Amino acid sequence: MNEVFDRERTRTRTAELVAALPAVEWITDGRVERLSQDFYWFSPVLERQLRGLRADAVARPRTEDEIRTVVAGCAAAGVPITVRGSGTGNYGQCMPMHGGVILDLSAYNRLLWVRPGVARAQAGIRMMEMDRQTQATGGEHGLGWELRCVPSTFRSATLGGLYGGGFGGVGSINHGPLASTGNVLGVRAMTIEPDPKTVELRAPQALLLHHVYGTNGLVLELEVGLAPAYPWLEAIVCFDGADAGFDTAIAFADALASAPGIVKKSVTLLAAPIPDLLLAATPLLKGTMSAGSHAVFVLVADFAEPAFQQLVAEHGGTVTLRKTPAEVRASNRTIVEYTWNHTTLHALKVDKGLTYIQSGFEPGRHVQQAKTLRDKLGDEVLVHLEFIRTKEGAMNCSGLQLVRYTSDERLNEIMQIHRDHGVYIANPHVWRVEDGKQGQVNPDIVATKLRFDPQGLLNPGKLRGWAERERIVADAAAGRVSLATLPRF
């Protein structure tokens, strides 16, 4: 099927589906507009390009049978389907380019089972709720378990949403991005056909549907690795001094991230003036950071505090916030919600002229690369680094740098300057899969879509490689390209 959908025909057939399936919860009122959006507006480029996109209806199924009913109806009628978790992602991942039905999986949200180090859940479960249930398995004296990495939006973000549109998050300092071997063990997916089938994909094939915006398969369940749920101490460490302070702050952050004997969950560097933006954005941080300082936000196991404090002293930092695990629980607030994409969210409350970029540094050179780029770009780019392990296990950092936006041309120049210095850019100002993190057409992704979504109804328009599917099939048949092996279904 060509990705040209007649909008009037789609509206009519969607309305017919809504009328024909009264047992499913449908949303057709003004809420559809909100449910058709994500945080695309972080990008001034995407805000112009995607503004006004809207589904024709939202289905909110609660069971697999209801999902199958909606999928079968859409497939029979040729109606596009855009899968949604909680809509906390970026780049318009869950925004429908061609209308149709948004399949909101937030009510399909059960934790199915927990075993030591692994759990299985339905795609719509919120990660905060999943952690609550898995942590409870430790009993009165046991640690229990928790997700290996969560986004800063963990309160509302779903497990399926992280898998379909995310990269990593808090915890990736130990376990790498979600795509690291052992993090995703299996997924159960549904084909988009008039008679939908369900298929279990085990790792590594389970990653064929990862981070492609729900374009090549509908994921119902995920089986993921868990980590011990240590009691986490939260702290902010500040460093004063414009340049010397930054150099010391990044040295401290890197030393803490790399220290194998200090159990940790998160290390975030926010260079000045980002702490000032956060202080202006929320009164909850009042008194937690000194004006003009560089700040490192840290989660370490409470029993690791002496070693952590030793590193602070060695680097001349000042602990300006310290919250015990009990205090974090009692307040129901965490500094996690000022890291990762929440940093950008809070900064935009204060300065709407900001946007951001996403970058990946080179292990072993990451500290020097960050210093060099800060020197070169000055106050035009504000340094925000998240320390993580790579898929291969090396300590590194990812950047979510804030950028003072002036024009699309200058934004592209800034990203190119990073590339010229050996820093990878996952462009957050584009909405097609291959134009962002993927970087190029992946034949395996396209071939998987052909198997799971032969009509091209899933999130149409987002996968550039779909237009090349015939060439990819021909190349595979001629032996010019080797494709991943999928189970028979």
What spans do the regions from the language model cover?
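Conserved glycine-rich FAD pyrophosphate-binding loop
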Residues: V4-F5, R54, V79, S86, ...
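FAD-binding subdomain of flavoenzyme oxidoreductases
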Residues: M127-M128, R132-Q135, G142-A255, A484-F489
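General beta-strand structural signal in soluble alpha/beta enzymes
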Residues: W26-G30, A59-P61, I81-G85, L103-L105, ...
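Helix N-cap motif at beta-to-alpha junctions
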Residues: A242-G245, V298-P306, E362-H366, V403-D408
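N-terminal flexible segment immediately upstream of the FAD-binding catalytic core
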Residues: M1-A72, T88-V118, L279-L285, A330-D351, ...
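Short amphipathic alpha-helix segments
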Residues: F246-L279, P363-E380, S407-M415
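A conserved active-site cap/scaffold subdomain adjacent to cofactor or substrate pockets
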Residues: K264-K265, P273-K323
